[in-house]
């Protein structure tokens, strides 16, 4: 297996792992996961009742088994950006693609965690500061 195949396999594995774990994503009770999932907990249909009286947070409302979490969506944004930039990393393109996915009206539908929300805020603030500086420089 060459280096490109290893990278492709790692990315594919990350997408599969994200989708396989969605049913118990953010359920922090390993005994409960064992009770509900048994020997094959992967690709469990997300169910809010699984989280009742357990440590964790149900964040998969509207999702079905095999869907991606917001982490999978973030990987998709990164790969789409790399593809659109011919394999080159362009942080400005990635930031734009990230905002198009996760900001209000974006294509991602689902739970937005604090890190994603904070990233959106920092990108907006940075863009506002850049625009303000450009306007001041222009005179």
What does each model-found stretch correspond to?
Residues 1-139:
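Structured, active/binding-site neighborhoods that engage oxygen-rich ligands
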